[in-house]
């Protein structure tokens, strides 16, 4: 079970005094909570407890909605995978190949790494040289936007990271 610590805002703050940081990041020192609330309301912002300490909490005057939005955005970015994988067969058509290369260009421009893997099954193993040439072609096609992080011709995998 994950315990989410809820931030206290405005009238939820029960402490008689807070250590205040105003909306311009100036340290205001120890101030009564009521007075800090009045300051926050005068600039049409919220009083948010940033750090709950034993003696007096540290409160900051800011836009609480904007703070929540930025926190949610940071969580989304940290959860996003950074390695995208594209799988090929040795006899892929030109249109499919170009489509995958375009996708890889978009991912590399966003900052994600791209891993290309060529899968050989059964009788396709006789096309191993052709698959190796395809890996080289992928590297040359993406050389403008990315650089090779690892190239393994034995297992037919190449990983390209943004340049």
From Swiss-Prot:
Which GO terms of the cellular component aspect does the record hold?
Answer: cytoplasm
Family matches, as SUPFAM superfamilies = Translation initiation factor IF3, C-terminal domain, Translation initiation factor IF3, N-terminal domain
Q: Does the keyword Protein biosynthesis apply?
A: yes
* Superkingdom of origin organism: Bacteria
- What is one GO biological process annotated to this record? ribosome disassembly
Q: Which GO terms describe its molecular function?
A: ribosome binding; translation initiation factor activity
Keywords linked to the UniProt accession: Initiation factor, Protein biosynthesis
**Entry's family note:** Belongs to the IF-3 family.
Q: What is the name of this protein?
A: Translation initiation factor IF-3-like
